[in-house]
Curated annotation (Swiss-Prot):
Belongs to the tetrahydrofolate dehydrogenase/cyclohydrolase family. Pfam families: THF_DHG_CYH, THF_DHG_CYH_C. One of its GO terms (cellular component) is cytosol. One of its GO terms (biological process) is purine nucleotide biosynthetic process. NCBIfam families: PRK14192.1. Its EC number is 1.5.1.5, 3.5.4.9. This is Bifunctional protein FolD. InterPro entries: Aminoacid_DH-like_N_sf (IPR046346), NAD(P)-bd_dom_sf (IPR036291), THF_DH/CycHdrlase (IPR000672), THF_DH/CycHdrlase_cat_dom (IPR020630), THF_DH/CycHdrlase_CS (IPR020867), THF_DH/CycHdrlase_NAD-bd_dom (IPR020631). Disulfide bonds: none annotated. Pathway: One-carbon metabolism; tetrahydrofolate interconversion. Catalyzes the oxidation of 5,10-methylenetetrahydrofolate to 5,10-methenyltetrahydrofolate and then the hydrolysis of 5,10-methenyltetrahydrofolate to 10-formyltetrahydrofolate. GO terms for molecular function: methenyltetrahydrofolate cyclohydrolase activity; methylenetetrahydrofolate dehydrogenase (NADP+) activity. Keywords: Amino-acid biosynthesis, Histidine biosynthesis, Hydrolase, Methionine biosynthesis, Multifunctional enzyme, NADP, One-carbon metabolism, Oxidoreductase, Purine biosynthesis.
Length: 280
């Protein structure tokens, strides 16, 4: 069996070409440029790299980014003040608070302070609830990117048994709800799940979203399954042991180059959508 490679890098590039045309049209029509504001608290090197990548993606499609860097000592109140300032800035169309924040900051409180119409990373409780009820909302960027990638390759989810390993509020939980909304039958597993291999073996579609390198072993996954790996760890490995799978599954996302590019691409797409709504 030759597995289909779900190439997120290629899909993101093709989408960027369309987004660039839409941004150009919007700028010509309104004289305004969509802006994504990114907030980085502290000096975590990985977080700084991710923020830089998001700014670069904005520029590739003709959008602007506003990079806000706050010191490690920032308090919850100070961060809330900055978020409220951005909420009230009509020139800003999307707000991203880079995860994680320092321990003294109430991350959930700060996420939920982001105005719903600027929550382009899909991190607020309100946004999650609206998405879950199939109401208009911006989806969490990584699971929404996964859904877009599967759709780009005509992967049908209706009636499939999807096993999501991981339950984080910005990945596992919204991923499960999006799959449920696509009429899949969903099983959620996590660190307290008993007999994890037995659940994984039942999956038509397996989503690794647990944040532990190669926790999900190749011999747990049945032939012909669709494998989505949302993890990335040093050495270019994900949450799933991909190597032995490539000649016996139906499709898989490579690591890197699968889910990651679609996460950033979805953030840019949703920022443009927000700009279109706000600028008219």
């Amino acid at each position: 069996m030759t597995a289909l490679v779900l190439d997120g890098k290629l899909c993101a590039k093709e989408t960027e070409n369309r987004l660039q045309a839409q941004v150009t049209e919007l700028k010509e029509r309104t004289g305004c440029t969509p802006i994504l504001a990114t907030i980085l608290v502290g000096a975590d090197p990985a977080s700084a790299t991710y923020v830089k990548m998001k700014g670069n993606a904005c520029r590739r499609v003709g959008m602007d980014s506003m990079a806000i860097e706050l010191p490690e000592s920032t308090t919850t109140e100070q961060l809330l003040d900055k978020i409220n300032e951005l909420n009230n800035n009509p020139d800003v169309h999307g707000i991203l608070l880079q995860h994680p924040v320092p321990a003294q900051v109430d991350e959930r409180l700060c996420f939920d302070a982001i105005a719903a119409h600027k929550d382009v990373d899909g991190v607020t409780c309100l946004g999650f609830g609206r998405m879950a009820m199939k109401e208009p909302a911006y989806g969490a960027a990584t699971p929404a990117g996964i859904m877009r990638l599967l759709a780009a390759y005509d992967i049908q989810l209706e009636g499939k048994h999807v096993v999501v390993v991981g339950r984080s509020p910005i990945l596992g939980k919204p991923m499960a709800m999006m799959m449920l909304n696509a009429n899949a039958t969903v099983t959620m597993c996590h660190s307290r799940t008993q007999n994890l291999p037995e659940f994984v073996k039942q999956a038509d579609v397996i989503v690794g979203a647990v944040g532990k390198p190669e926790l999900i072993k190749a011999d747990w996954i049945k032939d012909g399954a669709i494998v989505v790996d949302a993890g990335y760890h040093p050495g270019g490995i994900g949450d799933i042991e991909l190597g032995p799978l490539k000649d016996r599954v139906a499709a898989y996302t490579p690591v890197p180059g699968g889910v990651g590019p679609m996460t950033i691409n979805t953030l840019i797409l949703q920022t443009l959508e927000s700009g279109l709504k706000q600028l008219g």
